[in-house]
Amino acid sequence: MTPVIEVEHLSTRFGEHWVHRDLSLVIEKGEVMALVGGSGSGKTTLLRQMIGLLHPTQGQIRLFGEPLFTGNAAQERNLGRRFRMLFQYGALYSSFNVFQNIAFPLRELGVIDEDLIHNLVMLKLSMVELLPRHAWLMPSELSGGMIKRVALARALSMEPELLLLDEPTAGLDPDRSESFVRLIRSLHRQLGLTVVLVTHDLDTLAGLAARVAVLAEQRILALGTIDEIMKVDHPFIRNFFCCDRAQRALQSRMSEEKV
């Protein structure tokens, strides 16, 4: 089976500063992969490169088996329909209400009638556990957690195969964060999504990721399950994965798996 994302010998430089050097990574269909690393390690840069938003200095990226950055507009449009990205702060259109935000990509297609768009929007709202009455609220009237859910509903409106999440629980209190993680986990199972996320939150990482890629020293320092990563003897990994908070998050994950 063709991997969803293939990154081969990727290097990234901004001015004189190298962010990545000779980085390679494969993400298979249906898995949940987390990218973690310190500030400036290039996590979000890599996430954006995976879908063609940023051009690497060297190397190649293939998405669903197709090379990116070819300049082929038709290919880019076709690939663009197969993935969606949830940005850290939702990126909702402030002058649109919730319904209009979710309907926007559907209307852009120009081939779906308004009755069907209405039904699809209401379905996606239900999928992210929001009510029909929420459709008529403006973004300024939404809580942080609701903004995340509306942005997720908009992403799901195009029936993507690949979902990319940039700090999906940033700014949420623990209860709302846990609820959002459960929602993503449920949608991953129901829809067979491939999910790639950037996070620094240990509870999110433990609650979602099947595999983790640790970015440090301009490369992928370690790749594997959380249990495998924790066996790697490196200062960043010890500090990130072996602190008291990490142990509590992992213990919570183990308790959930037993239920």
Regions inferred by a protein language model and the residue ranges of each:
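Conserved ABC ATPase "signature" region
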Residues: 115-133
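Conserved ABC ATPase signature
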Residues: 138-142, 146
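Helix-to-loop junction immediately C-terminal to a conserved catalytic motif
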Residues: 51
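Catalytic Walker B motif of ABC-type/P-loop ATPase nucleotide-binding domains
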Residues: 163-166
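Conserved catalytic motifs of ABC-family nucleotide-binding domains
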Residues: 159
